[in-house]
């Protein structure tokens, strides 16, 4: 399965996509928690392709209960196992600190499309379940081709 296929699969399952919505709301606590999870320096870094695969596993494993879920990351970190765990954590921390990884929280509810195509890349859009929005999203990254997807969130 390609990275594009993985992304589109997640888009069709929004419950798995909005898990990390309020990342920067609890930014310093998250970084501290992640840093405590790192046991040792990785022997090597992950390729961009492998980084994306591991990030998707991580994001899918997070609970979708708002910012508090970021303060309890242990279960989600278990999704990244084996030799890549240490490297993934180091790269995740580095990307967060440098703002290379951007997780956006949208605060607009409505039926009009939100055009996010002018945002800097790479980025992931992860929304909380209480939002209802139709979003057109352009994702660009070195490991991903341009992908335009539309998806809807409706709060039950």
Curated annotation (Swiss-Prot):
Protein name in UniProt: Uncharacterized protein HI_1480
Gene3D superfamilies (alphabetical): 1.20.272.30
Pfam families to which the protein is assigned, alphabetical: HI1480 (PF22186)
């Amino acid at each position: 399965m390609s990275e594009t296929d993985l992304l589109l699969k997640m888009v069709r399952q929004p419950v798995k996509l909005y898990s990390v919505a309020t990342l920067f709301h609890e930014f310093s606590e998250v970084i501290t928690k992640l840093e405590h999870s790192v046991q040792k320096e990785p022997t090597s870094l992950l390729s961009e392709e492998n980084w994306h695969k591991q990030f998707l596993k991580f994001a899918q494993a997070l609970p979708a209960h708002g910012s508090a879920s970021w303060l309890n990351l242990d279960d989600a970190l278990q999704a990244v196992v084996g030799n890549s765990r240490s490297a993934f954590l180091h790269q995740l921390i580095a990307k967060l600190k440098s703002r290379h990884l951007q997780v956006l929280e949208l605060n607009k509810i409505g039926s009009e499309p939100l055009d996010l195509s002018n945002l800097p890349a790479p980025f992931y859009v992860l929304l909380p379940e209480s939002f209802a929005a139709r979003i057109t999203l352009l994702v660009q990254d070195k490991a991903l081709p341009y992908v335009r997807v539309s998806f809807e969130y409706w709060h039950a």
